[in-house]
Amino acid sequence: MLILYQLERTWGIPNLSHFCCKTETYLRMAGIKYTVRPTLPLFAPKGKLPYIEDGTFKLADSRFIIRHLKTKYHDLDQELSPTELAHSLAMQRLLEEHLFWATMYSRWQYTDANWQVNKKAIFSVLPPIVRDFAAIFYRRRIQRQILGHGTGRHSADEIFELGMQDIDALSAYLGDKTYFMGDKPTGLDASAFGFLINTLGCPIESPLKEHALSKANLRNYVNRITLQYYADLQPLGKAAEYTRK
């Protein structure tokens, strides 16, 4: 059976890693049998999660994993036209190459309170003797990545303004559709859910989260996918009733 290596589940969401959540959601949407083995990035190929083992085959990076799943098991995008595939790719790039950095800034740099929540969720599984060292090492590493990407060169207000533009675009593109590309889930939905649940459903507070919660169609979308594909989890609680005053 295919083995998915990812972070330990916490926060009442499928995974606190956007990309782990994306990959597991694709597996569930595609009806592919798998088992999960929790691990940390320092034990992973390329130093990143998720990665999979499929027999003797080992593969890292959610993009390459999903390409493998499409080829060997089931392609959720098989009915999309070339134009629809282009739209899907563009939206995934928005999620994974832009919105991602605003959420990472929220967790690793924005406030000490957010960092403590993030630190506990990721590093509490380590022995105390190495826990703080690993947390400091990875925090500095990710802060350098945020700066190198360019996001970290902006003020907090500017970073969240850019992230809110992404949220507005996602809400407008989804509209009143069941899924982003229509009536059936596609690869874009696996990615969108992974990123939206990690914005709306995690205990990391920021103006970006508040803005995302103000979008009724995005809240309903996250709850709909949670109920359909993660029956072992609860949908958004008070967030589902949230309305911006």
Q: What function would you assign to each model-found segment?
A:
Residues 1-132, 200, 245:
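GST-like domain detector, emphasizing the conserved glutathione-binding G-site
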Residues 36-41, 183-185, 237-240:
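Acidic carboxylate-rich catalytic motifs and surrounding loops in phosphoryl-/glycosyl-chemistry enzymes
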Residues 101-219, 223, 227:
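GST-like fold's C-terminal all-alpha helical module
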Residues 232-245:
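Charge-dense, extended regions
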